[in-house]
Every structure is written in structure tokens, then in C-alpha cells.
């Protein structure tokens, strides 16, 4: 039998009403558009559009 170990590098994702988390679980690898948004977030957040602030 093979024992699967848990990866504790990222927080565990649990959907609970008393401790809400975002709908999207934490991701290990960002897409190109997500990386671009992360770089844009390093500047002033007032330059972000409303859609970018929601993402």
C-alpha cells in the first residue's frame, strides 16, 4: 500500500461557513495573465481597473 503525504507548502482549502475562504483554492502555478496582474499590483492599486481589483 502507498501512503500519500500531504503537501503543507500551501494552506489547506476547506469550504466552511464560519471561516470563509475564496471560491478558488490556492494555486501553485500562475497563468501568464495572473503573473501580469501580480506585477501590476506591485504599483499603485489606484491604477487597477475594477475588474482587476476583483480578480
UniProtKB/Swiss-Prot annotation:
Swiss-Prot/TrEMBL GO biological process terms: mitochondrial electron transport, cytochrome c to oxygen
UniProt region (Disordered), positions on chain: 32-55
UniProt-listed InterPro entries: Cyt_c_oxidase_su4_fam, Cyt_c_oxidase_su4_sf
Stated role: Component of the cytochrome c oxidase, the last enzyme in the mitochondrial electron transport chain which drives oxidative phosphorylation. The respiratory chain contains 3 multisubunit complexes succinate dehydrogenase (complex II, CII), ubiquinol-cytochrome c oxidoreductase (cytochrome b-c1 complex, complex III, CIII) and cytochrome c oxidase (complex IV, CIV), that cooperate to transfer electrons derived from NADH and succinate to molecular oxygen, creating an electrochemical gradient over the inner membrane that drives transmembrane transport and the ATP synthase.
Summary of subunit composition and partner proteins: Component of the cytochrome c oxidase (complex IV, CIV), a multisubunit enzyme composed of 14 subunits. The complex is composed of a catalytic core of 3 subunits MT-CO1, MT-CO2 and MT-CO3, encoded in the mitochondrial DNA, and 11 supernumerary subunits COX4I, COX5A, COX5B, COX6A, COX6B, COX6C, COX7A, COX7B, COX7C, COX8 and NDUFA4, which are encoded in the nuclear genome.
Family named by the database record: Belongs to the cytochrome c oxidase IV family.
Name of the protein this chain belongs to: Cytochrome c oxidase subunit 4 isoform 1, mitochondrial
Gene: COX4I1
Amino acid at each position: 500500500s502507498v501512503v500519500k503525504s500531504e503537501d503543507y507548502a500551501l494552506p489547506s482549502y476547506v469550504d466552511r461557513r464560519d471561516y470563509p475562504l475564496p471560491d478558488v483554492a490556492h494555486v501553485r502555478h500562475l497563468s501568464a495573465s495572473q503573473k501580469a496582474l501580480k506585477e501590476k499590483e506591485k504599483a499603485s492599486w489606484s491604477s487597477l481597473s475594477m475588474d482587476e481589483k476583483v480578480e
